[in-house]
């Protein structure tokens, strides 16, 4: 181990290059190459929830991405914070919003297709964030995703499903919108809002919406900065594309820990997250973002990856990155995006057949639960 200790001491003594070295011709040339080759990433937040996400990203910062707020409601758009803003459907809605009707939101996006194309020009990767169930986000997100994908960008939609408290109508709107979104984007990361209440059941609804916005923002920031921010283990755009291109549905799990065996605790928390409440054994692949302060070790990161790999098919493609964030102060944070999953929120191309299959599986489970309960009662009496 002596050679390792010697190497550490030498690295600590090593000085940064002088300013004259940094300003050399070769460094300027390298900097120019890096700037020109950097993936162009846009985060489009459409509708109320989408605008909240880009506003939150503007507050916490997302390195290497531009934010674009899109809305049919001029007032909501005015109060949003983003690098760029786009009011869609001026003739259809007149800046007054879509009235909670997805068909109106879709019509507004179609009216403004040329404007949307201009905003997305030259993008390598586009995130489209929205809350499903209302008018603008549900209606416009599939149109925006389709235009981004047609322009050649890797297109990742990140969408929330509504709380049950929002009513059956919004739920039905959300399910129809999700089906359209799946057809339009490369990957759709679904965040079921009801699952947030399993973590904090007594959370007031307004606070629950804020938590949903935070999770949307963290998901987008985590994936983006795996590409744009240098790390302990860095990824490039091609790495992320290999997982997310044409992957269909995806779910996300998050966990963090600071005491004991923090690496294992954080990954188990992420895998057991209510947001990732489904069988992932047949998933196509996983994207793992590991963050920690300067005491994060490569061994800890590798243990996290090994645990995730054990849960997936041996042929699944796993890409991971590790980043140092000093503000975490002894905390390890693990974010897992599992792509190519069968989601309970959409039934895919075979619709009713798959729905019947899932319902039959649930009936079998209920039957087993009832028989176990009967045995328990018989044993007691």
Swiss-Prot record:
Residues 1-25 are annotated as: Disordered. SUPFAM superfamilies: Tubulin C-terminal domain-like, Tubulin nucleotide-binding domain-like. GO terms for molecular function: GTP binding; GTPase activity. It is found in: Cytoplasm. GO terms for biological process: FtsZ-dependent cytokinesis; protein polymerization. Residues 7-17 have a biased composition (Basic and acidic residues). Its main location: cytoplasm. It comes from the Archaea. GTP binds at residues 48-52, 135-137, 166, 170, 213. Keywords: Cell cycle, Cell division, Cytoplasm, GTP-binding, Nucleotide-binding, Septation. The keyword Lipid biosynthesis does not apply. GO terms for cellular component: cell division site; cytoplasm. HAMAP family: FtsZ. Homodimer. Polymerizes to form a dynamic ring structure in a strictly GTP-dependent manner. Interacts directly with several other division proteins. Belongs to the FtsZ family. Essential cell division protein that forms a contractile ring structure (Z ring) at the future cell division site. The regulation of the ring assembly controls the timing and the location of cell division. One of the functions of the FtsZ ring is to recruit other cell division proteins to the septum to produce a new cell wall between the dividing cells. Binds GTP and shows GTPase activity. This is Cell division protein FtsZ. It comes from Methanothermobacter thermautotrophicus (strain ATCC 29096 / DSM 1053 / JCM 10044 / NBRC 100330 / Delta H). The lineage of its organism: Archaea, Methanobacteriati, Methanobacteriota, Methanomada group, Methanobacteria.
